[in-house]
Amino acid sequence: METQQGFTLIELMIVIAIIAILSAIGLPAYQNYLQKAALTDMLQTAMPFKTAVELCAIEHGGAANCSEGSNGVPAGKGSRYVSAVTVKSGMLTLSGQESLNGLTVMMIPQWDGLEGQMSWQRSCSTSQSSLKEACENVFRFDDSDEVAE
Protein backbone atom coordinates (compact mmCIF):
# COMPACT_ATOMS: atom_id res chain seq x y z
CA MET A 1 0.00 0.00 0.00
CA GLU A 2 1.29 3.44 -0.87
CA THR A 3 1.66 6.02 1.86
CA GLN A 4 0.16 9.39 1.16
CA GLN A 5 2.39 12.39 1.30
CA GLY A 6 1.31 15.99 1.72
CA PHE A 7 -0.69 18.13 4.06
CA THR A 8 -4.20 17.62 5.25
CA LEU A 9 -6.84 20.27 4.80
CA ILE A 10 -6.79 21.04 8.53
CA GLU A 11 -3.02 21.61 8.50
CA LEU A 12 -3.32 24.01 5.56
CA MET A 13 -6.15 25.91 7.24
CA ILE A 14 -4.07 26.28 10.42
CA VAL A 15 -1.14 27.69 8.43
CA ILE A 16 -3.45 30.14 6.64
CA ALA A 17 -4.95 31.24 9.98
CA ILE A 18 -1.46 31.84 11.44
CA ILE A 19 -0.47 33.91 8.39
CA ALA A 20 -3.69 35.94 8.68
CA ILE A 21 -3.03 36.67 12.36
CA LEU A 22 0.55 37.75 11.68
CA SER A 23 -0.64 39.95 8.81
CA ALA A 24 -3.27 41.59 10.99
CA ILE A 25 -0.58 42.48 13.53
CA GLY A 26 2.13 43.50 11.07
CA LEU A 27 0.17 45.59 8.58
CA PRO A 28 -0.84 48.45 10.94
CA ALA A 29 2.72 48.64 12.28
CA TYR A 30 4.04 48.87 8.73
CA GLN A 31 1.48 51.55 7.82
CA ASN A 32 2.52 53.62 10.87
CA TYR A 33 6.14 53.26 9.80
CA LEU A 34 5.33 54.53 6.30
CA GLN A 35 3.34 57.44 7.75
CA LYS A 36 6.25 58.49 9.97
CA ALA A 37 8.63 58.26 7.02
CA ALA A 38 6.33 60.52 4.99
CA LEU A 39 6.13 63.02 7.87
CA THR A 40 9.92 62.99 8.14
CA ASP A 41 10.09 63.85 4.43
CA MET A 42 7.69 66.74 5.10
CA LEU A 43 9.88 67.95 7.98
CA GLN A 44 13.01 67.76 5.81
CA THR A 45 11.23 69.75 3.12
CA ALA A 46 10.34 72.46 5.67
CA MET A 47 13.77 72.86 7.27
CA PRO A 48 15.47 74.99 4.55
CA PHE A 49 12.51 77.39 4.65
CA LYS A 50 12.59 77.50 8.47
CA THR A 51 16.30 78.29 8.45
CA ALA A 52 15.86 80.95 5.76
CA VAL A 53 13.06 82.63 7.74
CA GLU A 54 15.24 82.65 10.87
CA LEU A 55 18.14 84.27 8.99
CA CYS A 56 15.79 86.78 7.35
CA ALA A 57 14.29 87.68 10.74
CA ILE A 58 17.75 88.25 12.22
CA GLU A 59 18.77 90.47 9.31
CA HIS A 60 15.52 92.46 9.18
CA GLY A 61 14.55 92.56 12.85
CA GLY A 62 11.47 90.39 12.46
CA ALA A 63 9.72 87.97 10.15
CA ALA A 64 7.23 90.42 8.60
CA ASN A 65 9.33 90.83 5.43
CA CYS A 66 10.22 87.15 5.12
CA SER A 67 8.14 85.71 2.30
CA GLU A 68 9.00 83.13 -0.34
CA GLY A 69 11.16 84.39 -3.16
CA SER A 70 12.48 87.43 -1.25
CA ASN A 71 15.06 88.30 1.41
CA GLY A 72 16.83 84.96 1.06
CA VAL A 73 13.72 82.82 1.50
CA PRO A 74 13.54 80.34 -1.39
CA ALA A 75 10.47 79.93 -3.57
CA GLY A 76 8.19 77.14 -2.42
CA LYS A 77 8.86 73.68 -3.82
CA GLY A 78 7.20 70.47 -2.79
CA SER A 79 8.46 66.92 -2.51
CA ARG A 80 7.04 63.43 -2.81
CA TYR A 81 4.72 63.93 0.17
CA VAL A 82 4.42 67.74 0.07
CA SER A 83 2.24 69.24 -2.66
CA ALA A 84 2.96 72.87 -1.78
CA VAL A 85 5.09 75.02 0.52
CA THR A 86 4.18 78.66 1.05
CA VAL A 87 5.99 81.25 3.14
CA LYS A 88 4.22 84.50 3.92
CA SER A 89 5.44 86.92 6.59
CA GLY A 90 7.58 84.11 7.99
CA MET A 91 4.70 81.66 8.39
CA LEU A 92 5.35 78.32 6.68
CA THR A 93 2.41 76.31 5.38
CA LEU A 94 2.93 72.80 4.04
CA SER A 95 0.21 70.78 2.32
CA GLY A 96 0.49 67.01 2.25
CA GLN A 97 -0.14 64.63 -0.61
CA GLU A 98 -0.15 60.86 -1.21
CA SER A 99 -0.27 59.19 2.24
CA LEU A 100 -0.40 62.65 3.88
CA ASN A 101 -3.34 63.85 1.78
CA GLY A 102 -5.53 66.26 3.76
CA LEU A 103 -2.74 67.24 6.18
CA THR A 104 -1.80 70.90 6.54
CA VAL A 105 1.12 71.92 8.74
CA MET A 106 1.56 75.55 9.75
CA MET A 107 4.76 76.73 11.39
CA ILE A 108 4.40 80.21 12.89
CA PRO A 109 7.51 82.14 13.94
CA GLN A 110 7.50 84.01 17.24
CA TRP A 111 10.15 86.75 17.09
CA ASP A 112 11.53 88.16 20.33
CA GLY A 113 13.08 91.47 19.31
CA LEU A 114 14.60 92.14 22.73
CA GLU A 115 16.45 88.84 22.84
CA GLY A 116 16.91 88.57 19.07
CA GLN A 117 15.62 85.01 19.18
CA MET A 118 12.95 83.12 17.34
CA SER A 119 10.75 80.30 18.55
CA TRP A 120 8.19 78.36 16.54
CA GLN A 121 4.63 77.27 17.06
CA ARG A 122 3.21 74.49 14.94
CA SER A 123 -0.26 73.40 13.98
CA CYS A 124 -1.18 70.09 12.34
CA SER A 125 -4.64 70.04 10.76
CA THR A 126 -6.24 66.86 9.46
CA SER A 127 -9.38 64.83 9.93
CA GLN A 128 -7.39 61.71 10.91
CA SER A 129 -6.56 61.73 14.62
CA SER A 130 -3.68 59.25 14.29
CA LEU A 131 -2.08 61.35 11.54
CA LYS A 132 -2.48 64.52 13.61
CA GLU A 133 -0.82 62.88 16.63
CA ALA A 134 2.06 61.56 14.50
CA CYS A 135 2.47 65.01 12.91
CA GLU A 136 2.64 66.70 16.31
CA ASN A 137 5.34 64.24 17.40
CA VAL A 138 7.45 64.70 14.26
CA PHE A 139 7.09 68.50 14.16
CA ARG A 140 8.07 68.89 17.80
CA PHE A 141 10.63 71.59 18.48
CA ASP A 142 12.08 72.21 21.94
CA ASP A 143 10.58 75.68 21.98
CA SER A 144 7.31 74.86 20.25
CA ASP A 145 3.82 75.30 21.55
CA GLU A 146 0.80 74.06 19.70
CA VAL A 147 -1.32 76.75 18.12
CA ALA A 148 -4.85 76.81 19.52
CA GLU A 149 -7.32 75.83 16.81
Model-derived regions: residue spans:
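Periplasmic/extracellular, small/polar-rich flexible segments of pilin-like filament-forming proteins
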Residues: 57-149
